[in-house]
Amino acid sequence: MTTLLQINASINNDNSQSSRLANQFVAAFRDRHPDAKIVSRHVAANEPVPHLDGERFGAFIAPPEARSAAQHAVVAYSDSLINELQRADVIVLGLPMYNFGVPSQLKAYFDHIARAGVTFKYSDKGPVGLLTGKKAYVFAARGGLYVGTPLDTQTSYVRDFLRFVGISDVEFVYAEGLNVSPQSKEAGLAKAAAEIARLAA
């Protein structure tokens, strides 16, 4: 049975354009794969992922036998996020752009799943990702027009991070110009909808 993990990163939950795009794809995927297991994770709304601080980082690097109860709880939370990824065959990310970057809660999520020896390992040829054999779809919603410009650091950051943990098969779908004008918004959403239909076919 195929497992799809949907990660929505908007602070506006399902009311955001990025979440709506991701939801559209997941609905189409479910229609084509009725037996698929769908798992949802909202990293910025409902129960936001905590930001990394010294105490949380210390929990990750402490030897298991030396961890306090609080540190064990931090690692257990990280493990639960990682386990979702490990079990997933398909990953869907709803990605808004906030001030040219990713939501800070998504960065916090990445910080909790990038664990040496768990999701990647070091080798004499560089880091090796361990979350292999997965397909990822990223649905990015932006108010302006950024694809192909130096301001689109978001795409390379997300692609590089996913590759770092072993997820190299990644497709991006963009809905851009959503705040430029009503016509631009309509065109941007229509283009994204066409891409979703193509990917879900």
Protein language model annotation of sequence segments:
Residues Q71-S156:
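Helix-loop-strand module that forms the ligand-binding subsite of alpha/beta enzymes
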Residues S10-N13, M97, R142, E176:
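Residue-level signal for short, function-critical loop segments
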Residues L5, V39-R41, Y137-F139, E171-V173:
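Hydrophobic/aromatic beta-strand patches that form the interior of the parallel beta-sheet core
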Residues M1-L95, V102-S104, A108-D111, A194-A201:
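N-terminal beta1-alpha1-beta2 submodule of the flavodoxin-like/Rossmannoid cofactor-binding fold
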